[in-house]
From Swiss-Prot:
Protein name from the UniProt record: 2,3-bisphosphoglycerate-independent phosphoglycerate mutase
Binding-site residues for Mn(2+) 1, renumbered to this chain: D404, H408, H464
Cofactor(s) of this protein: Mn(2+)
InterPro entries, per the entry: Alkaline_phosphatase_core_sf, BPG-indep_PGM_N, Metalloenzyme, PGAM_B_sf, Pgm_bpd_ind
UniProt GO MF annotations: manganese ion binding; phosphoglycerate mutase activity
Organism of provenance: Nitrosococcus oceani (strain ATCC 19707 / BCRC 17464 / JCM 30415 / NCIMB 11848 / C-107)
Highest classification ranks of the organism: Bacteria, Pseudomonadati, Pseudomonadota, Gammaproteobacteria, Chromatiales
Enzyme Commission number, as recorded: 5.4.2.12
Reaction equations catalysed: (2R)-2-phosphoglycerate = (2R)-3-phosphoglycerate
UniProt enzyme class: isomerase
Amino acid sequence: MSTPPRPLALLILDGWGYSEETASNAIHAAHTPIWDTLWDRYPHTIIRASGAEVGLPNEQMGNSEVGHLNLGSGRVIYQEYTRVNRALRTGSFFTNHTLTEAVDRAVKSDKAIHILGLLSPSGIHCHEDHIHAMVELAIKRRCQEVYLHAFLDGRDTAPKSAQASILAMQAKFTELGKGRFASLIGRYYGMDRDHRWPRIQAAYNLIATGQAEYEAESAKQALAMAYERGETDEFVQATRIVPSGKAPVQVKDGDVIIFMNFRSDRARQITRAFIEPDFTGFERLYWPKLAQFVSLTEYSKEFDIPVAFPSEKPQNTFGQVLAKLGLHQLRIAETEKYAHVTFFFNGGREQPFEGEDRILIPSPQVDTYDQKPEMSAVEVTDNIVKAIESDKYDVIICNYANPDMVGHTGDFNATVKAIETIDQCLGRVWAALQSAGGELIITADHGNAEKMYNAQYQQPHTAHTHNAVPFIFVSERAAIASANGSLADVTPTMLYLMNIKPPPEMSEHRLIELSSP
């Protein structure tokens, strides 16, 4: 068998979905001569990236974490969201040892339970049903003080859609006869993942001490006040909820915190602020001595905290297969998506494999990426081209963050510019691979930029989509693309193209079949 071309590069265009709808489609509106040429000239197909095809509930939109887990594992990975939902259906959630032990500890000491989480129906980082269930568990186990510190979405949901979630949560408190909102703040602050510590500090101070820019008697009133200030859900400033006759809530020594986000990347920073004795992100004016800090899922191997639903780590992932064969691989992305091409692509493994190099390009320090839609794509591309020219690597895996991160802003024109930036970068990578004799696969992890307006809410669409994503095989080898694939089929197909037999744990479906010479 002949030696396959090298390197084989995989470019993951984050948030570049496929849709034949042209209205509000930033990808369609953009000038993309390189993309158009590649799509027309080379074998291509579309692959599924949401719902059950990636281990999520039916009709659940995909996301970057899930997408990269499926891509790197080469199989469908059933997500924490699905596992928690199953526990709710069977009732085992309410007997989960980690959760019940934490609640019982607070009850025995007559202390408070503080529940943190993204109060959202999106199911990307958290789901409000899980928060409702946790409140119910705590109250039914006779906890007298149950407080919810709610992060608001507006990014994976419509920008102004939190009222329904707040009203549903308040109805749950009323039904149970106990519990209340303690604070509201947008996810922009409480769920930062790019080491913008002043944002986390605002959320930490709100939760830990009750310190806030604003105060309201109810969560509904707090949201209305934020809208009057011109804020959308994602950007709601720190607001403490203090009903008439009540005192502001703060976390006291001996209290228990339970963090209900199941996705780890945006949960880590604020968790560090609560659990690390030597935390240096900002100066904590007050650090409560908690009885326990419990996370719904594992946020980091470094965290010595109880986990309600421990991770299930896949074996024989794509990176592991390459390492076992002594091959060299490069992972590269800017800050916003670096964890996705490393930790998530490796099936939840923090450490690089043998022969795996990593390059992190800092994301620009701007408030929102519509201010700089090109982000750091040019610098990422500079490093990819150098890596190709070095002749060191057998495989290069890169994530371009722009379509997703700029798409999340809801700014159509900025997202068009982001797409055009990526198109120019594709041209440079393609040219470098042609000179080196390598091959290229282009795909995405989920949709976003192909839908920029929500007709139902009559406002910008800032969330992911349910759409399939493109897949292109750029090679001079004769090949045909096959249909009915998903993200789980991408890396098994890459192994096939490299003359490597995929391990039995991986998908057997190929997205490309090489033709006989």
